[in-house]
């Protein structure tokens, strides 16, 4: 469920897409039909670089065993399935694409058309392209079929939010409590109408709904279960059509105590690009159910606007979008954990520099720690966002006690800062943005450093944006540290 903004400015998953398990005639039918076989009595023949399927009068089609082509089998794995399909003599237009218990409906025509879906297999069922109902005994054609495994676990999120150089995005665990984050037809609404999949969304596909507001007292909201006296953030992407910007207002309603938590909150929206709107609030005592309104306006207003990617999450700030396609209890994105161990040859325990260019996700009064260790927090070289507002701290911890603690308070931890922590026996220095900010002339260092981790402290893991992370095996000179952090 973890998304990021890619180099093209699109919101999508950080993933690795493998090669197609279908190759040669199993994919392109250049000289034959490969290993494709009949499903429920259909007739399959090779027809000039394509597969021709002659239907029976009932459910029928073509299929191929993909499970045997995949190391470890296909169950539990996600695939991008793509195929070009079109009518021959059949008048039927409704077909299905199936793999391992998952399927999607498609509508074909006489024009060769590509269909692409992401399907997660739950069993070994063959990849099947078929008509699921009775009909005529005509033909349809299949060509250019691919099935590529998609891997999202253990893939770092390289994020391009804001443009320019990317960063590694490390976020805490969050759950999107909005059950239908992209399908507004499932929301509760007033008199406004919804055009489904009307325009291109922030993920680059045509799956964003457009709302048409015809009169006064219109609204649209989704309900969610909450915990009383808890911080939440409601967010969504919006793009304005013909509606006046001044008419766009959101609200959050306490459905337990029958009162608004926030109401008539105006928000900005462009008519040329998507804007992410965020609203923080705290649930009142006893509140266990809320309504999150993406639009609520009692004034006389007309016009259109589009909404996509709604999210309600517990926390003090909004995190990256977590798609939810109908899970009432919410979809969870696990915390990002980065650890590299067994690198003792790359770290000098006697002296060195830990350098980062980082920005915080929030100045939220928590400790967020990363560092190098010999396998545990008690013996480590640390950099942290401190619980003090906008405070950066560097420390050496030996046997559970701190040998040195260096501090500097920046203007805003949400901005990127270049930070270098020099460590050496009786010689410690913290450099930030081209200046030496704090020093300590007494203290020992840790031996046997061999691990670099964003979760060196199990109770205070690091969350933030990382543009650069470097480890130097010598204590750099002041001139070098100046150049490195400037």
Model-identified regions with their sequence ranges:
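Short tryptophan-centered beta-strand motifs in secreted/extracellular beta-sheet-rich domains
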Residues: 115-119, 234, 277-281, 414-432
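Short, aromatic/His-centered strand-loop micro-motif at the edge of beta-sheets
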Residues: 62-71, 103-108, 219-227, 258-269, ...
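Extracellular carbohydrate-recognition regions
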Residues: 1-41, 143-144, 148-191, 310, ...
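Short carbohydrate-recognition loop motifs
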Residues: 43-60, 198-218
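Flexible glycan-contacting loops in extracellular carbohydrate-active proteins
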Residues: 122-126, 289, 304, 440-465
